[in-house]
Amino acid sequence: MGTRDDEYDYLFKVVLIGDSGVGKSNLLSRFTRNEFNLESKSTIGVEFATRSIQVDGKTIKAQIWDTAGQERYRAITSAYYRGAVGALLVYDIAKHLTYENVERWLKELRDHADSNIVIMLVGNKSDLRHLRAVPTDEARAFAEKNNLSFIETSALDSTNVEEAFKNILTEIYRIVSQKQIADRAAHDESPGNNVVDISVPPTTDGQKPNKLQCCQNL
């Protein structure tokens, strides 16, 4: 059945954020269990699921966290974001208000999460083409302006769901790998330590990627 769940080289925590009803839970279940529930109700509290993928011969275990987007769950934000190295910021392409709220979610993410977290903007429910309210080009331009990656998905018909999660996990892995190489070069040693200090390029203007500057000496 492939790699056992307890065997992995890296463990990355990725959080799903965005308004309630945009399809976060179904993105999670589609990627981790290949399931979709048309009757799914708003998530109560927090839940997470895991799935492992292979990147460059390494086993990457993703621990993906999902919480409801309603305001009353704001109290859990600190614990929810703690330790996250990636985030999927999800909106519904058929509901413009969920896209308008992306900016607020992005601010909350940057207030609570590590400043170097990798963020992907996800326009979900791309199967609802006839109801589209958010132009793809508009969302892509917003993502570029805010240094986010961007993709449109459909949890219902599986379009780009694998790609969304695998792309963000691969991006995190590349950054971690470069950080390890840079650290070893800087210290001129390779201390067999499995604890990875993750430093990713900044997602906000005006910040410098301090931890990666040692690469310039290579």
UniProtKB/Swiss-Prot annotation:
A Gene Ontology BP annotation from the UniProt entry: establishment of protein localization to membrane
Membrane topology, record value: Lipid-anchor
Origin superkingdom: Eukaryota
Location of N-acetylglycine modifications: G2
Entry keyword set: Acetylation, Citrullination, Cytoplasmic vesicle, Disease variant, Endosome, Glycoprotein, GTP-binding, Hydrolase, Intellectual disability, Lipoprotein, Membrane, Methylation, Nucleotide-binding, Prenylation, Protein transport, Synapse, Transport
Name of the top EC class for this enzyme: hydrolase
Residues bound to Mg(2+): S25, T43, D66
Residue numbers spanned by region Disordered: 184-218
Residue sites binding GTP per the record: 20-21, 23-26, 37-38, 40, 42-43, 69, 124-125, 127, 155-156
Lipid tethering residues (S-geranylgeranyl cysteine): C214, C215
Main location: membrane
Functional note: The small GTPases Rab are key regulators of intracellular membrane trafficking, from the formation of transport vesicles to their fusion with membranes. Rabs cycle between an inactive GDP-bound form and an active GTP-bound form that is able to recruit to membranes different set of downstream effectors directly responsible for vesicle formation, movement, tethering and fusion.
UniProt subunit comment: Interacts with KCNMA1. Interacts with RAB11FIP1, RAB11FIP2, RAB11FIP3 and RAB11FIP4. May interact with TBC1D14. Interacts with ATP6V1E1. Interacts with PI4KB. Interacts (GDP-bound form) with ZFYVE27. Interacts (GDP-bound form) with KIF5A in a ZFYVE27-dependent manner. Interacts with RELCH. Interacts (in GTP-bound form) with TBC1D8B (via domain Rab-GAP TBC). Forms a complex containing RAB11B, ASAP1, Rabin8/RAB3IP, RAP11FIP3 and ARF4. Interacts with WDR44.
Protein's name according to its UniProt entry: Ras-related protein Rab-11B
Gene source species: Homo sapiens (Human)
Gene from which the chain derives: RAB11B
